[in-house]
Amino acid sequence: MQRNEVVQLTVVPKGLADPFPYILDYARGKRVLNVGASGGVENYLPTKRESWLHHRLGKVAAELVGIDIDSESVAFAAQHGINLLVADCEKCSFTQTFDLIVLSDVIEHVNSPLLAIKNLAKQLSPNGYLLITTPNPNHYGLVLRAWLGRHTEVYYDHVSALLPEHFQAISNRLGLKLCDVMFFSHLDRRSFENRLKSYLARLLGRLAPRCHGSLMVVLQLD
């Protein structure tokens, strides 16, 4: 939706306590393509397999295909019996279609988010879904840093920061339907400071969902 030259969301954003049950419900009994499947795989295999999104998707999906552009991480997964494909989501093509395509913290890495979404939409079955998670540019920590005059920390391979309104604009341009927008915060257990920040993000997110650390959008091939 557009008002004058400003994008208007067609859905009301919501807060989400835990994104994984939501993602797995979408994947249950479906043909699923997991894009960026080997991201962080070295942290999960072999001992923390149950926490790995690709493994969890495999438990509920009727069929699961995983791709990643990082050939080294794909090779690492293969050493542990996991078959993934080396592929670029901006260019890949399949002989089959998928009911659900998942991009979990991937879209901020790609050269062109719009081209990636456009190409992946071609791999969807009729009425299929694209489910995308990405860091939230309005995260309370970033706003606080701006107020305090501190520099913004950006990961070296993150090249875009997308708001829900950007996904609405992309959907409008590509003829997709924006079905849902949700904000959530992962619980970071790596240190006491990180846990404290996570709990604060969750607390503030209850009051204002856009304070959460991450966002999720669901796009449908309409």
Residue positions per predicted region:
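Residue-level marker of regulatory loop/turn positions in helix-turn-helix DNA-binding domains and
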Residues: 24, 95, 208
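Conserved SAM-binding loop
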Residues: 28-143, 162-168, 215-221
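N-terminal presequences and immediately downstream first alpha-helices
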Residues: 9-25, 32-37, 61
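Generic anion/oxyanion-binding catalytic loop in active/binding sites
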Residues: 21, 102-105, 156
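S-adenosyl-L-methionine-dependent methyltransferase catalytic module, highlighting the catalytic core
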Residues: 3-10, 16-18, 45, 90, ...
